[in-house]
């Protein structure tokens, strides 16, 4: 790893040095039962306790020597670089919020510019803006009157504490993702401005392996770095096969890349298998925690550079068990640790609460949710060091420690 690189992630388990989180905010308080489907939530977390749990997560990482950065802070700092950048950010945010009324757009621009502190403005954008919060808002136009019942001008963004999905660090670059749903695709604007304008990243020659303007979808929960040469990507409920090809072309043909193969895993299209990392994460050099439903046989496609056609890919289909695929490409014996010990009922329960979604902070050392006690006991018996965090409220969003974190720098193995 070069010391001057702002980003460096070449594995899932290298010692974690810097991570990006989002502390749950008022967007959680703006969830109501009627909005759950629209905002992709199954339940309403209790914000006070969710914050306490998230703070415990962040403190666990700090005590392990990890630098913890926050999405909301970096976004606010990024737009402080110039008023032109700030106004562009505000305008783009409003457009992507789906605001069609010109009067509402003007009112929102005035409202956001009324904040003297950029951090408070960003927090408000994330939390959502109610119509009643806009100064002198009157329902005079046809648009305003027809849409009078819905309370928000800009929807809240409760999924933001899952920082894994809007972008993903791969090597010394990122995929700035196009999310499957409009609700979540709005989240990627923060990463766009952070990596283009924040002093920490501006001018650092960060390659973008994928861009949020692409029309096909890619989400960070489907991107797992198996080694400095192999990237695994799930073809899932949230990630398209076309996106995997676009990513592979840019990554494999980049002049300074170490990656040689992209493995595309076709996984079931269902809520329980939403992303690859909900059913499969690495915990040590040779150990992975998995949902029993993904052990295979699986359809896996190996994407490599085509030696006879520059700029093109060779795609090779393989049908085999997960263990055999990993053994072949990592060139070592593999131990799969089944969520819930393989028990059908326990596995389903703990999988629902992300028992297979762990965050490695070093080889053989991971962060896990307390509620998945059966899987946790099995991990400990396999020699894995656990950092157990409280999880009664955070888990209501259906994401675990890996979902809630985006590594920016890991030590190379």
Curated annotation (Swiss-Prot):
GO terms for molecular function: arginine deiminase activity. Pathway: Amino-acid degradation; L-arginine degradation via ADI pathway; carbamoyl phosphate from L-arginine: step 1/2. One of its GO terms (biological process) is arginine deiminase pathway. GO terms for cellular component: cytoplasm. Keywords: Arginine metabolism, Cytoplasm, Hydrolase. PANTHER family: ARGININE DEIMINASE (PTHR47271:SF2). This is Arginine deiminase. It comes from Clostridium perfringens (strain ATCC 13124 / DSM 756 / JCM 1290 / NCIMB 6125 / NCTC 8237 / Type A). The lineage of its organism: Bacteria, Bacillati, Bacillota, Clostridia, Eubacteriales.
């Amino acid at each position: 790893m070069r010391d001057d690189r702002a980003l460096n992630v070449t594995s899932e388990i290298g010692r974690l040095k810097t991570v990006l989180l989002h502390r749950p905010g008022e967007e959680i308080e703006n969830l109501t039962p009627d909005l759950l489907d629209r905002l992709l939530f199954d339940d309403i977390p209790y914000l006070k306790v969710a914050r306490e749990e998230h703070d415990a997560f962040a403190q666990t990482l700090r005590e392990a020597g990890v630098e913890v950065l926050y999405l909301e802070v970096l976004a606010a700092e990024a737009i402080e670089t110039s008023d032109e950048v700030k106004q562009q950010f505000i305008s783009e945010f409003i457009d992507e919020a789906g605001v069609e009324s010109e009067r509402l757009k003007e009112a929102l621009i005035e409202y956001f510019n009324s904040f003297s502190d950029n951090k408070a403005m960003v927090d408000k954008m994330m939390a959502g803006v109610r119509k009643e919060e806009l100064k002198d808002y009157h329902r005079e136009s046809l648009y305003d009157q027809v849409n009078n019942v819905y309370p928000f001008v800009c929807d809240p963004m409760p999924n933001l504490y899952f920082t894994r999905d809007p972008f993903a660090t791969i090597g010394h670059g990122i995929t700035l993702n196009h999310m499957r749903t409009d609700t979540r695709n709005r989240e990627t604007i923060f990463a766009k401005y952070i990596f283009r304008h924040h002093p920490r990243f501006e001018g650092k020659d960060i390659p973008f392996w994928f861009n949020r303007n692409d029309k096909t979808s890619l989400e960070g929960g489907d991107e797992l770095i198996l080694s400095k040469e192999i990237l695994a990507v799930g073809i899932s409920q949230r990630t398209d096969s076309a996106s995997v090809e676009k990513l592979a072309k840019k990554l494999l043909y980049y002049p300074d890349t170490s990656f040689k193969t992209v493995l595309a895993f076709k996984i079931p299209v269902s809520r329980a298998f939403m992303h690859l990392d909900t059913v499969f994460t690495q915990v040590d050099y040779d150990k992975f925690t998995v949902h029993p439903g993904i052990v295979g046989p699986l359809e896996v496609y190996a994407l490599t550079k085509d030696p006879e056609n520059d700029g093109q890919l060779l795609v090779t289909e393989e049908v085999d068990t997960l263990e055999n695929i990993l053994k072949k490409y990592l060139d070592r014996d593999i131990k799969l640790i089944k969520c819930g010990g393989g028990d059908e009922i326990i596995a389903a329960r703990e999988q629902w609460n992300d028992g297979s979604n762990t965050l490695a902070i070093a080889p053989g050392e991971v962060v896990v949710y307390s509620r998945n006690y059966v899987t946790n006991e099995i991990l400990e018996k396999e020699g894995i060091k656990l950092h157990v965090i409280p999880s009664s409220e955070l888990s209501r969003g259906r994401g675990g420690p890996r979902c809630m974190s985006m590594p920016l720098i890991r030590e190379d193995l």
